[in-house]
């Protein structure tokens, strides 16, 4: 999956934004909370970090190219270092799921505000 496709998909999710952070990382956020980190090596993707449910963690990290994300909450974030480990459709599904998990943890008032926008 190419950077343009991942960026376009992530920004198509309601109220998502992107900033460049921590050097060469694109950090996608909703209401100021991150749901996707894209590591960059120039114009090439050097891995994705996404949120997952703790019960999904073991199955995901058993896939070659998917590991526990460094510097993120244990068993809640995974790093996809090899983008061929998951199909493009599965990556989209996982990015959307990460977004939904982050939105679900936002305060109810913030969620209500997002729905009204």
Regions found by a protein language model. Name each.
Residues 1-117:
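Charge-dense, helix-prone N-terminal extensions
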């Amino acid at each position: 999956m190419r950077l343009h496709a991942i960026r376009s998909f992530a920004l198509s999710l309601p109220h998502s934004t992107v900033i460049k952070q921590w050097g060469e990382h694109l950090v996608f956020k909703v209401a100021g909370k991150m749901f996707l980190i894209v590591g960059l090596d120039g114009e090439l993707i050097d891995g994705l970090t996404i949120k997952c449910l703790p019960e999904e963690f073991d199955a995901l990290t058993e896939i070659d190219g998917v590991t526990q994300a460094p510097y993120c909450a244990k068993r809640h974030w995974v790093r996809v270092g090899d983008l061929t480990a998951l199909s493009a459709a599965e990556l989209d599904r996982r990015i959307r799921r990460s977004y939904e998990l982050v939105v679900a943890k936002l305060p109810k008032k913030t969620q209500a505000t997002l729905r009204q926008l």
